[in-house]
Structure formats: C-alpha cells, structure tokens
Design a protein with these regions (language model features):
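Glycine-rich anion/phosphate-binding loop at the beta-strand->alpha-helix junction
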Residues: 196-338
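Conserved alpha/beta core surface patches that mediate binding of polyanionic ligands
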Residues: 62-71, 101-115, 152-179
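Glycine-rich, mobile lid/loop segments that gate access to catalytic sites or pores
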Residues: 122-261
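Flexible, glycine/charged-enriched surface loops at secondary-structure junctions
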Residues: 46, 114-120, 157-173, 217-229, ...
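Short, hydrophobic/aliphatic alpha-helical segments
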Residues: 60, 68-76, 183-190, 250-265, ...
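Conserved phosphate/anionic-ligand binding catalytic regions in large, soluble enzymes, centered on
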Residues: 71-101, 195-203, 261-287, 361-371, ...
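Acidic/polar, glycine-rich intrinsically disordered N-terminal extensions of enzymes
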Residues: 1-87, 115, 119-123, 402, ...
Length: 434
C-alpha cells in the first residue's frame, strides 16, 4: 500500500533499508524521484505538489480572498505507529527541524522500541446553554426523563444515514455551572459519534434541533447551541517504549518531564513541542488545526500533556490527547494536496488518522526532550458559508454551483440543517431539469 511498509519488515530490514536513509542529503528533485521509485508518489502527483491550491477552490473556501498563502509540505520517513511503518508521513509546517525530528525519532523507535496508540472514545460533544434556570434539579429531571426519546428522534429523523454508518447520538447529560456573581447556568451536553467526520456542522445542527423541544419541556430559554472543541469523548492515548537509553540521559528526560508536569510556564513550551507534530500532520490532512490546539491546551490546563519515566533500562512516554479529526467533509475532499496526503496514508479512517497524529506528537515530544537534555446562532451562518464547498464536493460544475447553492439555501432556511446528501439530491434534480 502507498505510504506503508509491511509489518513483516518492521523488525528486520526496515531500519537498514536504503530507501529510508539519506533523505536530508537529497535535493528536492532527488527526494521526489525516491518517493516515485518507492511507489509513494506517481509522476502525476508532481503537479499537485507544485501546483498549490487552485484559485477556483480557494475562492469558495473563505471570504474576501486575495491569494493563497503557501506552507512547506514535507514527508517524515519510516514512522512506526502501531503495527505499521509509514514510509512517508505528510507534514505541513513553516518551522525548521519538525519533520527531521519526527524522522530521527522514528528511526530510534524502529530500531529499539515501539509506539502504540489507542482510541479511548469516538463521541463529539455539543452544548446547549440555559441561563437563569429557576429549578436546576427539576430541569435536569425533565431532560433526563426525555433522554431516550430525544436520542431516538435524532437518530431516526435527523441523522439516519450516520446511524447506518455506525454512528449516531449516544448520550445526553446535564451540568450545573456556578458563576462568580452568585448566579448559575445549566448546560445540556449531547454526545454524537460522527464516524469519519470531524462532526462540527452536524453537532451544531443537532443542538439547534434540540433547542425547541428542550425549551418547551422545561419552560426555559436556550442561549448558545454549539459543539465543544474540548473533545474529552474522543481521547487518543499514545505510548512509546524505548530501549537502549543511556541511564543518565533517561533520568534527565524524566526530570524535564516532571518540570513540565509541575510548572505551567514550562508546560506551555513542552506542549507546544507536541503540537508541532500534531498540527503539521493535521494541516497536511485538512483538519481544523485551531480546534485541535484549543482542545489540547484546555485539556492540559497548565500541566504537561505527556509524561516520561525511566522503568528499568527503558524510557517510557505516555500521552492522552483529545483529537477530533475527520477524513470526510470539510476540505478533505476538495483540496488537491489534502487528497494526496490522505492517499499517501492509505486513506485512513478518522480513528486511524487520530492515532497517526497522536503518535507523531509524542515522537516530536521525545525529540524535543532529547534535544533539550543534550548539551547545549452559528449553525445557519456557518453552514451558509459552507454551501459552496458542498456544491463542489458533490461534483457540481462551475455553471451548476450557483443554482445548487440557492437550492441548498432554501433547504437550510426551511429545516435549519443541510447535508452532502441534500447537495447530491439537488444536483441530480438540476441535471434532470436541464
């Protein structure tokens, strides 16, 4: 498979494979030839790598566009995550040494260790805020009494296709938040498993849909209805075990970890190093990097995201990180370089991509510590702006996009939600009428 070295080679020829050595000494053309020779790239991919983002697509992604801002795209090589070694791991970053660090630490782990990850949850959280609830406990009892019916309604009438794909709404909870002025807020949390989508748009639409029945049942008024980027229901754990570590160096790394775990000033820089890897893979694969950054730093809340300890002769690194990513939706299907990056990674599921991102972050963290211890109402507005992407994503040509966007705007105005299925249906209708 493209981008992957078969598992049977991991403990043998991989570390000495000539195709994995010397990349830093090659010029750009030689690196591309090496990747073409190994099957990671095809000659046709060179136009995508060098062509950047087409103006036509960029024009529909943001408002007031005047150009395209380039960021270097590189490949970390030989990255071992779980039972695979990724020959090429796409990373987009402006910062020197990030790609090299992941490649160098990958070589160490391939030769004398392992990097494993685990998916700890798949739910995306949405929040519906109710301010000045007169009887919070009574409110909670009413909402929890409606829980099963609301979940069934959502799964049957709002997201049946997602349920068919193995996802759906799974939970409703109520939280009470004291405010320093002596008042309080009550917040309804909804949890939706969004399959391979990051899920922001559908979660926002579900929160909007639930506003009416919750207000009617509780005689309370909802304020904000929006997803949370603190993705505590989509945690990924990453674990590195590295042998052959000099005991003095290992102890220094452990003490550096303790420094970050107990000092927020150091924690900020420690965690920034992790995010160097996380954000680079996320950007290359078309993810919302701001959402990942916000969730990670809130989750850390002044402490370190990772811990490192010497256990006997081995250095052990552990990390948990909220990673809500998607391999469908957003720009994943319209940005040519993102599509290429996904293909190089063998078109991973959202779970697999989250594992890759977490593992890369922990490798980056290991590299940083090694170096340091050496010398020296959002739904409608947002969805309206997203409609051109839906039109492009379903295959509408330049002449069809305007009428299709108008059609989708009508659906959004009538129902408060719109989906890729609506776009496909609308395109079929337009073509039937042509």
């Amino acid at each position: 498979m493209a981008g992957e070295i078969e598992n049977g080679r991991r403990n043998g020829a991989v570390s000495g494979d000539p195709s994995l050595s010397g990349f830093s000494k090659l010029d750009a053309q030689e690196r591309l030839e090496r990747f073409i020779g190994s099957g990671v790239l095809t000659p046709g991919d060179l136009g995508i790598l060098n062509g950047g983002l087409p103006s036509e697509i960029a024009e529909n992604m943001i408002e007031n566009r005047v150009g395209v801002f380039g960021v270097p795209l590189g490949f970390a090589v030989g990255v071992p995550i779980d039972d695979r070694v990724y020959f090429a791991l796409p990373m987009a970053t402006e910062e020197t040494s990030v790609v090299a660090t992941v490649s160098n630490m990958s070589k160490r782990v391939r030769e004398n260790g392992s990097l494993t990850t685990e998916v700890l949850g798949r739910g995306t959280i949405g929040q519906i805020q109710f301010d000045f609830v007169e009887d919070p406990q009574g409110f909670e009892a009413i909402v929890l009494g409606m829980k099963d019916a609301l979940i069934a309604d959502i799964n049957t009438n709002v997201i049946p296709k997602m349920v068919e794909r193995g996802g759906g709404m799974t939970d409703i909870a109520v939280r009470h938040i004291p405010i320093p002025d002596g008042t309080h807020m009550t917040v309804v949390h909804v949890v939706i498993e969004t399959c391979d989508a990051m899920g922001a748009n559908i979660v926002n639409q579900i929160c909007e849909y639930l506003k009416g029945p919750l207000e009617a049942a509780t005689n309370s008024q909802a304020n904000l209805r929006i997803l949370s980027n603190l993705a505590t229901e989509r945690l990924i754990s990453a674990h590195i075990e590295l042998g052959g570590v000099d005991p003095i160096r290992g102890t220094l790394i452990e003490r550096a970890s303790l420094f970050a775990e107990n000092d927020p000033w150091r924690a900020a820089t420690h965690n920034k190093g992790i995010m160097n890897g996380v954000a680079a893979v996320a950007l290359a694969t078309g993810q919302d990097t701001r959402a990942l950054e916000a969730g990670a730093h809130t989750y850390a809340a002044g402490s370190a995201l990772s811990t490192w300890r010497m256990q006997g002769a081995n250095l052990i690194g552990d990390m948990r990180l909220p990673i809500a990513v998607g391999t469908v939706g957003g720009i994943t299907h319209i940005h040519p370089q993102v599509r290429l990056a996904q293909r190089i990674l063998d078109n991973p599921s959202a779970d697999q991509l989250a594992r890759i991102i977490a593992g890369t972050g922990l490798l980056q963290n290991l590299g940083a510590l090694t170096a340091l211890t050496s010398q020296g109402g959002i739904t409608e507005g947002h969805m309206r702006l997203h409609l051109p992407n839906l039109a492009i994503g379903c295959g509408a040509n330049q002449h069809e996009r305007g009428p299709l966007v108008n059609y989708l705007e009508e659906i959004l105005a009538e129902t408060g939600r719109v989906s890729a299925t609506d776009a496909q249906n609308g395109l079929s209708l337009l073509r039937a009428q042509a």
